[in-house]
């Protein structure tokens, strides 16, 4: 079976890996420059910064079996067991990270797959020589017996306009929180303490990470995620104004250090506010998956991708 997967985040990559292992012909397309989606790591000079997902946890036995393989392969390691120093950073649940950054996980999963980045899916329509045709913005097209679409739901709606597929009303009303992220490289140690992560430390930020303490950066570099309220209120403000305000608000975490360089990254569709009750949704050999189905965490998205792949394999 020929399957095209739209989106090279963890949901799409997990689905593709599962299908390929079962002998199917799979192509993964993504508009980004590299696979990963929110498994995103950026390098600025000598600094390495995770600027999307900061870590992940494991609850489900199926996902745990995959994570154990990633650990054995040297791709993933435990970061800590909590971010509250009052409990000695230990609440019993490991937080995992990529050994050299979260994007390592995506690169590991993409290895051996036909992943085509810088490829923007434009529309889905019934095919002439296959069940479906995925049209690309450069005028080319990919034929498929089945499609797995893992991009955020607003982008999915746009793709399906020409496919004559009707989505449930509640799914079409799904909204997303936004996240504005400040990346700052420093000349000396920050005011963030071990293990290098702070959740909801103040009224501006939902997460602050020191990537050097975290263990992925040779230079001191902070990732600061503004919370949904701040991000929404300042989304359309002039970029320089947002940058300067975030730097001001970050001062308690920068401490006595000097900012060598800094930049802002914006995630418009960061976190779905409602979750579909099933791990995937399917109609006419088109399967929707991603964090809006499995839950707004790395584990949920991964399990959603596996669920989508399993569905297709069962109906063949």
Residue ranges: model-predicted function:
Residues 244-245, 250-284:
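Flavin (FAD/FMN) cofactor-binding core of flavoprotein oxidoreductases
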Residues 41-81:
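N-terminal FAD cofactor-binding segment of flavoenzymes
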Residues 20-44:
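Glycine-rich FAD pyrophosphate-binding loop
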Residues 1, 137-146:
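Core beta-strand elements of the Rossmann-like FAD/NAD(P) dinucleotide-binding domain
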Residues 36, 144-195, 257:
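Central helical "cap/lid" subdomain
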Residues 117-132:
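A conserved short coil-to-beta-strand element within the FAD-binding core of flavoproteins
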Residues 2-29, 309-313:
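N-terminal Rossmann-like FAD-binding beta1-loop-alpha1 element of flavoenzymes
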Residues 183-234, 245, 249, 253-254:
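Active-site substrate-recognition segment that forms the wall
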């Amino acid at each position: 079976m020929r399957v095209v997967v739209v989106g090279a985040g963890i949901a799409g990559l997990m689905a593709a890996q599962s299908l390929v292992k079962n002998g199917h012909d799979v192509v993964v397309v993504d508009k980004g420059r590299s696979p990963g989606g929110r498994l995103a790591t950026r390098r600025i000079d000598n600094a390495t910064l995770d600027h999307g997902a900061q870590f992940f946890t494991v609850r489900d036995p199926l996902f745990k079996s995959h994570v154990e393989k990633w650990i054995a392969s040297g791709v993933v390691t435990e970061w800590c067991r909590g971010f509250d120093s009052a409990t000695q950073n230990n609440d019993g649940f490991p937080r995992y990270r990529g050994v050299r950054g979260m994007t390592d996980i995506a690169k590991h999963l993409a290895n051996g797959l036909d992943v085509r980045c810088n490829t923007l899916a434009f529309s889905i329509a019934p095919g002439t020589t296959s069940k479906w045709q995925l049209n690309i913005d450069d005028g080319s097209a990919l034929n498929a017996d089945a499609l797995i679409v893992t991009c955020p739901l607003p982008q999915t709606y746009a793709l399906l306009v020409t496919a004559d597929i009707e989505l449930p009303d509640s799914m079409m009303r799904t909204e997303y929180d936004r996240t504005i992220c400040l990346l700052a490289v420093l000349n000396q140690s920050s005011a963030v303490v071990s293990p290098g992560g702070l959740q909801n430390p103040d009224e501006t930020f939902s997460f602050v990470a020191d990537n050097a303490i975290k263990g992925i950066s040779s230079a001191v570099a902070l990732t600061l995620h503004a919370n949904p309220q701040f991000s929404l209120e300042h989304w359309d403000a002039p970029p320089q104004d947002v940058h300067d305000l975030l730097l001001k608000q970050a001062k308690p975490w920068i401490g006595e250090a000097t900012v060598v360089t800094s930049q802002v990254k914006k995630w418009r569709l960061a976190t779905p506010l409602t979750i579909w009750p099933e791990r995937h949704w399917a109609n006419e050999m088109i399967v929707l998956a991603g964090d809006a189905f499995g839950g707004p965490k790395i584990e949920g998205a991964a399990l959603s991708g596996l669920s989508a792949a399993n569905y297709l394999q069962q109906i063949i």
